[in-house]
Amino acid sequence: SKSVEKNIISGFTSAGSDLSCKDVYLKVNDEKISRSTFSYGETFIICFDDVKGFTSENGYVFPGMGIVITDRAEDTLMMAEDLYNRYTDGMNFSPLQLTANLTVTDPIRSKGEYTLTINIWDKKGNGTFISKFDFKVIENEKIEPQIKNVSYNEIYLFSQGNNKVITDNIVHFEDNIYIIVEGLKGFKAENGVVFPGMELKGTDSSDDIILDYDDLFADYSETGIAESDFSSRVSAHFKLTGTAFNNPLNCELKIWDKKSNASLTVTTEMILK
């Protein structure tokens, strides 16, 4: 049997041949969602509930799941041939729920539109179930950049402790927090070297000074930094200790060119827990 369905709520378009699925939807932080726009670095889970039609062998079924992500030019950015290749002995869950995780980071970029295609198939039969989902990726709206004669690809917060991009601006004591800028261009290069300065300031809601660094690149004022390394990624990081704090942390990172008037200023508020 064959079926085609467009889920208005979830945004998925699905087509099944001998395989069927009760519901296809997304979850973020264990909550079912119906949006199709995500912040750079955000993770969502694609859920296929009560998948039926697989050929059964001694009560076990053998699904495969492949994922492809393409951009609007239909260029393939990411591909996973089979997320379930480790289940060589099959599955006997009932009802059968199949899931996949996606974190929207490099090679996915903010300010872009993409298509996610998921192909589920029966390794012991001919059944298939294909779902497509169009989504957009935006910059973290809690981060405000001001540019002067520069351009950049991405600006985001990163937790070393959790090894992931911070999208809700909630940070924790004792964690190493990074403010990362990728693809920063516009600085004047001399023999392949640029001469940046980097200032990091932070205050709490009582205007107490929490972070105060005038130039994190002071040691490179004479030698400079290789332009290729600088434009690839530049970052500042900090760690806050203790337990008492007057939220929020108002943070400002300024990166400027010591050889021109080019600069990037990043302001953001973080909540410490």
Model-derived segments and spans:
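A beta-strand/beta-hairpin structural motif
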Residues: 81-105, 215-241
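Extended low-complexity, serine/threonine- and proline-enriched intrinsically disordered segments
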Residues: 62-77, 195-211
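Short beta-strand elements
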Residues: 128-151, 262-273
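A short tyrosine-centered beta-strand micro-motif
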Residues: 112-119, 247-256
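Contiguous beta-strand segments within globular domains
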Residues: 32-64, 166-197
